[in-house]
Amino acid sequence: MGKGIRDISILKTIRFNLRYFGKKGVYFPVIITKNVILKNMQGKVELESYKTGNIRIGFDGTGICDVKNQRSIFDVTGSLFLGENVKIAAGVKIGVGEKASLKIGRESSINVNSQIICMNNISIGEGVIISWDNLIMDSDFHQIQEQTTLKDVSKPIFIGDKVWIGCRTMVLKGVNIPNECILAAGGVITGKYTEKNCLISSAGIKKHNVSWIR
């Protein structure tokens, strides 16, 4: 791992752990680098495990990115749950609005410059890989009227276990992705899917009975 001990922000790590975890925070389960901006810490963070260094925020991701110049942003006024051994790379932006809930399952990773914007409810399963430059967003932020009907501004997103999200993919409100699916790079994913082990693109299911190795 390119980033080492010298890149850890001791003050941010102490502040984060004691703010959210109280006495459990003395084990420093979350390690934060200097390039992470703790924009808003008014919300609630819960962990599956409080082992030292269990969660890493702001460390290296893919080798083709200049991680030294990437700024991660942590902006949580709602609720965030992180499973064991979740890795959040440099440049990742996480925003959880008031009364919203974001859950990321164990052994999942979010790569460089991806963004998760949660204003309702987003559930990400275990062993999920989110590649670089992705956007997962459960809200339109502006209400849309279709004829005489006002559409919902936000809808929950569900992503199952062992899903691989290719680079530069957008996952929008109301999406449901079953276990062990692949989201094609560059796709705009909408709608609900029920079939496991599929390759899904903007146009829908492209292949069936696919699998991938982490």
Where are these regions (language model features)?
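Flexible glycine-rich beta->alpha loop in the catalytic core of nucleotide-sugar glycosyltransferases
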Residues: 142, 187-188, 194
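Short amphipathic alpha-helical patches
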Residues: 131-134, 151, 186-187
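A generic "structured core" feature
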Residues: 177-178, 182-188
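A mid-sequence, solvent-exposed acidic-amphipathic segment
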Residues: 143-144, 148
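Glycine-rich NAD(P)-binding loop of Rossmann-like domains
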Residues: 149-159
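Short secondary-structure boundary/capping segments
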Residues: 149, 190-191
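Domain-scale signature associated with acetyltransferase and cell-envelope carbohydrate enzymes
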Residues: 1-137, 160-162, 169, 179, ...
